[in-house]
């Protein structure tokens, strides 16, 4: 508030929480409904008391195939929780699919806003058109993809927006899901040519797209510069084909999918060759990327050392660690993968059709991040 920023608390919803829990003994989700309602209602009251105008409950489990028991549990939970919202507004957010099994149940509850995924939700548009949308609620329409890095096609998106507005639906333009799944900004990418980056939209750029779409939706956009630029971009995408790759794919025969010799024969050959014990010992294939390993790779990337010096360092590391494995008596040795950085990026560099960024990091899990290559062509 001191910075002039209006924040919106976002927490995982009660229904998704109960559906993802693992239950032991005879108790099931319904046995915990009363306690969960009390906890969420208390949390909602605290958010509202602290000045939150909107509170968002994420309920991704609603896009699953739901039973009548699931729907009954969902209704029970939110009838209890929403009874305590007071002057606050509650947004129910869904993503990664549509809510075909419970659309009517959701819209009948006292939510102030409902977020629907219009991209991966194959039936979302159909559900809204066939059943309408309550006039007293706000539809948070997920029309800008929150999972991929590609620019939004304004022409297609504006058609959906106009169709919703024609039904007098109170619409807020939204991403299809959290922007956690995409890199932060294109501003950090200084080495990729514009012929590639002009097709990308990371998190900051997707917010800019939302702002542009909001503006375009309120005007005769067909002659607007932003719309025309976007239309031209999609009409002139560069050729991403690799004829050599396509030729190899076309030449694949059915027998190419059959590995020879047969498994039993390979198994016998390998057992004889390696003579491993019944339970062979080994380690994870990748050893820690220590400071000196990272320093060696960085020096090579900056051109501070030669390729031969880079390879010599890695070979020495491999030799040292093979010796350690032999000394402690491991049966299956690994070479430690000292030549690679992130696994996804490293193997992508061995293939055609990929682009590589400088700082387009995304979360893998927990605090671990990866910088995956971009699939551009064949």
Give, region by region, the residue ranges found by the protein language model.
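Domain-level signal for soluble alpha/beta catalytic cores
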Residues: 1-378
């Amino acid at each position: 508030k001191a910075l002039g920023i209006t924040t919106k608390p976002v927490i995982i919803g009660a229904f998704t929480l109960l559906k993802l829990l693992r239950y032991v003994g005879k108790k099931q989700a319904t046995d915990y409904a009363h306690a969960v309602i009390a906890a969420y209602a208390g949390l909602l009251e605290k958010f509202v008391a602290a000045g939150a105008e909107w509170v968002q409950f994420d309920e991704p489990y609603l896009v699953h195939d739901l039973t009548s028991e699931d729907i009954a549990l969902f209704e029970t939970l939110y009838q209890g929780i929403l009874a305590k919202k007071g002057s606050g507004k509650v947004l129910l957010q869904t993503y990664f699919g549509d809510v075909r099994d419970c659309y009517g149940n959701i819209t009948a509850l006292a939510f102030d806003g409902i977020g629907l995924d219009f991209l991966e939700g194959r039936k979302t548009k159909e559900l809204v058109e066939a059943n309408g949308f309550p006039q007293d609620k706000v539809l948070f329409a997920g029309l800008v993809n929150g999972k991929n890095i590609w620019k939004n096609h304004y022409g297609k998106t504006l058609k959906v927006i106009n169709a919703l507005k024609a039904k007098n639906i109170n619409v807020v333009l939204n991403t299809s899901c959290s922007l956690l799944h995409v890199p932060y900004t294109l501003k950090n990418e200084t080495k990729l040519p514009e012929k590639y980056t002009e097709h990308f939209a990371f998190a900051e750029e997707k917010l800019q797209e939302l702002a542009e779409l909001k503006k375009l939706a309120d005007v005769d956009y067909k002659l607007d510069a932003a719309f025309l630029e976007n239309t031209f971009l999609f009409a002139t995408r560069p050729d991403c084909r690799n004829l050599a790759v396509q030729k190899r794919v076309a030449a694949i025969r059915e027998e190419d999918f059959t590995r020879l010799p047969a498994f039993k024969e390979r198994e016998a050959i390998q057992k004889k060759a390696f003579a491993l014990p019944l339970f062979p010992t080994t380690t994870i294939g990748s050893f820690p990327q220590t400071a000196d390993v990272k320093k060696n790779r960085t020096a090579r990337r900056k051109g501070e050392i030669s390729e031969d010096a880079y390879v010599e360092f890695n070979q020495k590391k491999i030799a040292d660690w093979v010796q350690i494995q032999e000394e402690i008596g491991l049966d299956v040795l690994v070479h430690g993968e000292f030549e690679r950085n992130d696994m996804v990026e490293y193997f992508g560099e061995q293939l055609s059709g990929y682009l590589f960024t400088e700082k387009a990091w995304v979360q893998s899990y927990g605090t671990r991040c990866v910088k995956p290559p971009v699939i551009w062509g064949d």
